[in-house]
Structure formats: structure tokens, C-alpha cells
Regions:
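Left-handed beta-helix
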Residues: 2-7, 208-363
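Conserved core of the sugar-phosphate nucleotidyltransferase
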Residues: 125-245, 265, 315, 339-340
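Conserved N-terminal catalytic core of the sugar/cofactor nucleotidyltransferase
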Residues: 1-12, 20-27, 38-117, 123-127, ...
């Protein structure tokens, strides 16, 4: 199977607000549209580039919120408007995947689809392409869902975990269980056991199997669409979604489908992966500088500083002394200085407090 296979498609999920990476990621300009590392390509563009090696470029669809559609058009000018799905309200991934898969199915009912977040790093793209193509071949031949798992290198409470069940082939296992963001002590138990892999949130399926599972497990999504509009057109679909999407449940594809389906498998992968959604995960993924500090495209002078991550705007200089294990991040009208450990919970708390006490202009 090659990337010219006419049945292979991709859905890039790019509608999130990225609040775990606040204040660098803001409501008005979330992280997927940022060139966060100063490499010349945004996270969305890098995801598109990566997936265009696996499926034909004109088989890539982008889900995003309507307020971010112009960012997608500017950053991916080769993607046609019919391949950009504009969601009228923020919802979790289950409604997004259902809508994009429906649009793809109307073009090709034999489609095999990769659904991917837009905020991940892959360090071995050749291995990534190999694993993804093997995965697409697997879901083409089997009515199932396939999650891509990566062997954990540390106890990471900010990640999801997949417990391996029975082996069904080389590197392929039935999923025993999913656990989302465990406490650190449980994450250590998972890693030490050798039975758990990180959940990359990359999952593959054939569209017929997805349809069957939505009909059985989450029938409220897309119910009645095919009966109301038996003759497909993008215009009628967009109008229907603008009216009905807000009524869909705010639930992830993991909770709605994958954790409840009986036909979910995991592939052991080794393509070098990191979730770029949190400060701590970015710190762990990045190459460390002097005293294990990570400085991201920023101008900094440090003395007696260890294990920190720093991200500043262009034209700003930070002089830091005596910090150990901190995040120092500034964007526009917000400066964040907080401990790096378990920062996901801290950042979530601060975002909520700031929004309530200071207003949306700081979010």
C-alpha cells in the first residue's frame, strides 16, 4: 500500500483552544496555528506535511472552529474549502470525527481514515509513515479501530495510557483498557508493569465500522441527516451542521466510542512521539541545554538556574536567577511563572481564575 491508495484519508483535528499551553496559546490564536519552535512551520502545517506523506494531499480534511477557518486557509492554501469543516461551536472530538468521516464517506464509502491531533511531534518520520501505512492496511482488512501506542519513557500523568491485551499479530494487540491522565503514582505503576503504552490519540478505522459504532453507541450524532438530505451536497451539509452541531454532546471519541467498542486494537509503535499540548510534555521532549534548561526561541540570561522551560516573545530579554523547575512564559499581556511539575493542573486552575477575576482579554 502506498500513499497513492485512493481509499486512504486523513482527518486533522485543529479546533481546540490550547489552554494547557497558556499563555503562549490564546483563545484568539491557539497553539496549532503558532510556529512555536521558530522552525518556519506552524504545528498545523507540520501535521499536514507529515500526513501528506501517507495519504494523497487532496484526501486530507481539517476540522476547526469557525473563528479559526481563516488561519487554516492562510496556512494551508492548497486545501480546498470543501475540505475545511467549520464548526459553529467548540465541541470535543466525537462530533468532529463523525462529521468529517461523513463527508469523506459521501465521496468514498470504502474509505480508511487516520484521525490525528494537530499538536504532536514525531521524531522519526520514516518509521511513522511505515507504521501508519501498516495500520491503514490493517483497518482496511478488519472491521475495527486501531490506536497507535508508544512505549512510555517515564511516568507522565498528563498522557493517556493503553493496556495491552492479547496479541493478534506482530506488534498488534487487543486493547485491554484505556486510562486517561492517571495520578503520578499510578502512571509509575503502569510504566513499571510493561503492560501499558502511551495513547498518542492517533487512531485509524474504516468508515463503515465507524458508522456502525456511532449508530450503536452515540446515535444522537448525525441522526437523521441521511434521511433528511439523501442527495449529498457540501452546501446542505454545512447548513445542517450549523443548525445541529451545537446540540451534539461535548464528548471525546475516546470516551464515546473507543472505550466502549469491542473491536479496538493497538499497534506498538516506535517513531519518537511527544504531545506538544503541555509545558511539561514539551520540556520532556526537547533537547536540554546547560543545567537541563529548555529555552524555546527566546533571549535569556541565566544564573544558577536548572530544569526550567522558557518561552518569550521576540524582542524580549529575560534575566533569571535561582530558578529550579519552573515555567517562564510570556505572550502579549500575560506573564506566567509557575512550577513545571504537574503544571497541567496548575495552568488549568490559573486560566479559570484569570477568566473569572480578570476577564477574557487575558485568556
Amino acid at each position: 500500500m502506498t500513499n497513492n491508495d485512493h481509499n486512504n484519508y486523513c482527518i486533522i483535528l485543529a479546533g481546540g483552544k490550547g489552554r494547557r499551553l497558556w499563555p503562549s496559546s490564546r483563545n484568539a490564536y491557539p497553539k496549532q496555528f503558532l510556529d512555536f519552535f521558530g522552525v518556519g512551520r506552524t504545528q498545523l502545517q507540520q501535521t499536514y506535511d507529515r500526513m501528506a506523506r501517507i495519504v494523497p494531499a487532496d484526501h486530507i480534511y481539517i476540522n476547526t472552529n469557525e473563528e479559526y477557518v481563516e488561519f487554516v486557509r492562510q496556512q494551508l492554501p492548497d486545501v480546498s474549502s470543501e475540505h475545511i469543516l467549520s464548526e459553529p461551536i467548540h465541541r470535543n472530538t466525537a462530533p468532529s470525527v463523525a462529521w468529517a468521516a461523513h463527508r469523506i464517506a459521501m465521496q468514498n464509502p470504502e474509505a480508511c481514515i487516520v484521525a490525528t491531533p494537530s499538536d504532536q511531534a514525531v521524531f522519526n518520520e520514516e518509521a511513522f509513515c511505515k507504521d501508519m501505512l501498516e495500520g491503514l492496511h490493517f483497518v482496511a482488512d478488519n472491521s475495527c479501530f486501531l490506536s497507535m501506542g508508544v512505549k512510555p519513557t517515564r511516568p507522565e500523568p498528563g498522557y493517556g495510557y493503553i493496556q495491552l491485551g492479547d496479541s493478534v499479530g506482530e506488534g498488534l494487540y487487543k486493547v485491554q483498557s484505556f486510562t486517561e491522565k492517571p495520578e503520578r503514582d499510578f502512571a509509575k505503576i503502569f510504566v513499571d508493569s510493561g503492560e501499558f503504552y502511551w495513547n498518542t490519540s492517533l487512531f485509524l478505522f474504516n468508515v463503515k465500522h465507524l458508522y456502525n459504532n456511532f449508530a450503536h453507541l452515540l446515535p444522537s450524532v448525525l441522526r437523521g441527516y441521511d434521511e433528511k438530505y439523501p442527495v449529498f451536497s457540501v452546501e446542505t451539509e454545512n447548513a445542517y451542521m450549523k443548525e445541529n452541531f451545537p446540540s451534539y454532546p461535548n464528548i471525546s471519541i475516546d470516551y464515546a466510542i473507543l472505550e466502549k467498542s469491542n473491536d479496538v486494537y493497538v499497534m506498538k509503535c516506535d517513531f519518537g512521539w511527544a504531545d506538544l499540548g503541555t509545558w511539561h510534555s514539551i520540556y520532556e521532549a526537547m533537547k536540554k541545554g546547560e543545567n537541563d534548561n529548555v529555552v524555546i526561541d527566546s533571549d535569556v540570561l541565566m544564573e544558577d538556574c536548572h530544569n526550567n522551560i522558557v518561552k518569550l516573545p521576540k524582542g524580549k530579554l529575560a534575566v533569571l536567577n535561582g530558578l529550579d523547575g519552573f515555567i517562564v512564559a510570556e505572550k502579549d499581556n500575560v506573564l506566567l511563572v509557575c512550577r513545571k511539575e504537574d503544571s497541567s493542573a496548575l495552568v488549568r486552575k490559573y486560566v479559570n481564575e484569570v477568566q473569572i477575576k480578570k476577564g477574557d482579554e487575558f485568556i
